[in-house]
Structures are given as C-alpha cells and as structure tokens.
Curated annotation (Swiss-Prot):
It is found in: Nucleus. Residues 172-217, 254-324 are annotated as: Disordered. Residues 315-324 have a biased composition (Basic residues). Component of the Mediator complex, a coactivator involved in the regulated transcription of nearly all RNA polymerase II-dependent genes. Mediator functions as a bridge to convey information from gene-specific regulatory proteins to the basal RNA polymerase II transcription machinery. Mediator is recruited to promoters by direct interactions with regulatory proteins and serves as a scaffold for the assembly of a functional preinitiation complex with RNA polymerase II and the general transcription factors. The lineage of its organism: Eukaryota, Fungi, Dikarya, Ascomycota, Pezizomycotina. GO terms for cellular component: mediator complex. The keyword Repeat does not apply. The gene is med6. Keywords: Activator, Nucleus, Transcription, Transcription regulation. Component of the Mediator complex. GO terms for biological process: regulation of transcription by RNA polymerase II. Belongs to the Mediator complex subunit 6 family. It comes from Aspergillus terreus (strain NIH 2624 / FGSC A1156). Residues 185-201 have a biased composition (Polar residues). This is Mediator of RNA polymerase II transcription subunit 6.
C-alpha cells in the first residue's frame, strides 16, 4: 500500500474482489460508497468517514448508512470534504414504471468535492476530483491540466525530433543557394511512346522469376561498370605514354605551388631544330641558285684586297723575262 500511495493517483488502478464478496458479491447503489472507501483514493478526514464512524457507535445514526439517499442527504447538512455519487447507472437505466429501458452500463461516477454553507443561499460546492468505477475497478479521471500538459509534451517532442532531422537537410551551393533537398537532375531522354495496349489481361509474374531477373540485371550492371572503368584506365595510360613529355608552353613551370618560375628550355628548342642537309617531310624543296664563273680580262689588274693565285704569279714572271 505504501508503494501505491507514492505513485500518482492518476496512474494507478485499484480493485478488491474480496471486498465485493463481503458486500454481497456485486456492487449496487447502497454499497458503492463503502467499497470506494476501501480504496487509496478515499480521504479518511472526509465527512463520509466521520459519519460512518458515528453510525457504528451510535444507534441513532444507523439509518443514515442503510441507503445511499439517506447517507448523501445527511452529508448535505454538513460542510467540508465529501464523496458523493454523481452518476448511478441503475437509476439512469430504469424508467418511471420500474422497468429497464436498456441494459445497465455498470459504470459509476463519484465526485470528490467540498461543500460550504452560506446563510440564506444555496451551498457552494467545488468539485476537486472525479473517479470512475468500472465493474470492480476504480480509476481517477485525469485533470484538464494533465491532459493539456501531455498533449503539449507530445507536440514539443515531435517538433524536437523534426528539428533534429531538418538540421541535416539544408545545403548551400552557389548555383541553387539554400536548399533543403538535393537537386534532382532532369532527364534528357525523351519518353518512348507506349505500345498499343493488349485486350487480354497481362499474366502476373512469378516471384522466383522476378527475383532472378532482378539479380541478373544487377550482375550485368556491375559487369558493365567494371568493363567501363577498365577501358577508361587503359585510355588514360595510353594518353600519358603518348603525350606525357609535352607541354603547352615553350618554357614549362617549375617549382612548388606558390613559387612557380619559368624555366629556360634552350636544349629542348635546339633538339627540336632539324640538322643541316635534312629536310622535314612534307616541306617544299628550295630551288638552288646558278654558280657564278669568274672571267679574267688580260691587262686588267685584279681588284685590291684579293690574294693572287699561283697561276697569276707564273704569268707575271714570264712577262718580266720577255721584257728584259
């Protein structure tokens, strides 16, 4: 019982079949309040407890506990805390002729309330709590504050989970700006016209054949991607081998990032020049000029600055001897 008292009253359920057996085997209008008095929801300082104790020790109060109408009638003459039946399923189901209009629901409603006497006016009654008796089980109805608080807590919890999920969705790109979903590329393939529908019903595919087709399609896709990667790698190596030593500039850049310098490539330029006497394939040959023949005129002195050859020296010696 101590553990039950520590728990919130709105979260517990109380029932006692043994007390029901002691009270005649079923609950009715005259014993429902006494059955409720055995539950942890009952307050021992209420007017119900004091009136029951007085009826046990005073014969003049005995008739107050025989019927519920007499018991509640006596409570109305007192002020303070009390428990009264707010809804009686037997009275609600019975008609004026004493017959039942429908089967009783066996759900009782009990109010915990305070009564204050006012001279010349009706009593001021304030309802503090509401309890339900379903069969032999007693429940406490939750308050409006508890219901609203639970609803708000559920909404706040859902919003918190939403914010955690949405925090990872925003994405910023210079092209699209702030987006909350990844951009979907539009397909450029034109939709193929659908075939003419058949008048007969299409047979449903078997599960095994569908699974086998899915597995075969996945394997063919993987094989195609592996072949494409291998082909791309081979082409890359071929381009590297063929054009790996060529540069876009005559003077390639050397150095580290941030401190590049232009290198001199004289050796490369000299090596690219073709040797003398060789012609590049595809070039037009140049026409060679006619060699000039030198003709010496007798009696004409050679030009200054020219060194006489051996034949000229012999002619001069012969002329000198003939003159002597």
């Amino acid at each position: 019982m101590a553990g039950t008292q520590d728990a919130p009253l709105e979260e517990i359920l109380w029932r006692s079949p043994s007390h029901v057996q002691m009270m005649g085997g079923f609950l009715h209008s005259n014993n429902i309040l006494f059955y409720f008095a055995e539950s942890p929801f009952f307050d021992a300082t209420s007017n119900n407890a004091s009136l029951a104790i007085q009826a046990n020790y005073n014969e003049t109060f005995r008739h107050f506990v025989e019927t519920r109408e007499a018991f509640e009638g006596r409570l109305k003459t007192m002020q303070g805390l009390e428990f009264v039946v707010s809804y009686d399923p037997l009275q609600a189901a019975a008609q004026s002729n004493g017959q039942f209009a429908h089967e009783p629901s066996n759900i009782w409603v009990i109010h915990k309330q305070t009564r204050r006497k006012r001279p010349g006016l009706e009593d001021e009654v304030e309802v503090l709590s509401t309890f339900f008796v379903v069969g032999d089980c007693i429940y406490m109805a939750p308050s409006v504050a508890s219901v609203v608080g639970n609803r708000i807590l559920s909404a706040v919890t859902s919003l918190t989970n939403l914010m955690k999920t949405a925090a990872s969705l925003p994405n910023f790109t210079p092209a699209h700006g702030h987006t909350y979903m990844p951009p979907v590329s539009k397909s450029t393939d034109t939709a193929q016209p659908s075939a003419q529908p058949s008048k007969e019903n299409t047979p449903m595919p078997d599960a095994d054949s569908t699974k086998a087709s899915l597995v075969g399609g996945a394997q063919s896709t993987n094989a195609g991607s592996v072949f494409q990667h291998t082909r791309t790698l081979a082409e890359s190596f071929s381009l590297l081998t063929q054009y790996g030593d060529e540069f876009m500039d005559e003077n390639p850049l050397v150095g580290e990032p941030g401190s590049f310098i232009m290198s001199r490539n004289n050796e490369g330029a000299a090596s690219k020049q073709p040797p003398v006497g060789t012609t590049r394939p595809g070039t037009v040959p140049v026409r060679a000029g006619t060699p000039q023949v030198k003709v010496d005129t007798p009696g004409k002195t050679p030009d200054k600055g020219l060194t006489p050859g051996p034949d000229e020296n012999k002619l001069r010696k012969k002329k000198g001897k003939s003159g002597v």
